[in-house]
Amino acid sequence: MRIRHFATTAVAVGALAALSAVPAQATEYSSALKIKGIQYDAPGRDSNSCSTGNTDEEYLTIKNYSSSTTVNLKGYVVRDASSTNKFVFTANHYLQPGDYVKLRGGHGTDSDSGNVVYRDNCNFMWNNDKDTIKLYKPSGAGADLHSYTKSGSDPDGNGYITYHG
């Protein structure tokens, strides 16, 4: 009985040691598409003017991290923390494995070859101090989610944060 108790204790201690050696990880969604980075604070003074503003300098980079599957962005949704700012990819836009797209503010011509989609809206989507970026699959399931604060997530203060390399 004493040997059995010792063996059980040794196994439990070993399991705890193994668990403590694993680094803490954020919960990851099962999705090939991930938020690669965000230019949440456009360079210069913010201006929502469609003709002279800088909303096209605010962008979100979404990347297909699959090594074998092409993903169509049609139906994917991007939201901010309050969900008042929302963009739905309404057209077919295919991301080959390893490819990316920049979702920009303002107006322009969407281009698969240029890796850009415009929101056709001159309002800024992301807050300059803090916000949450939510990416949803067409089914409504989460694809990726990140929160940031200017002081905690952007130490060099350039308004750009990288999430997935």
Report the location of each language-model feature:
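Solvent-exposed beta-edge/loop recognition patches
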Residues: 27-34, 45-47, 86, 91-165
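The feature marks short-to-medium sequence segments in extracytoplasmic or secretory-pathway proteins
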Residues: 71-95
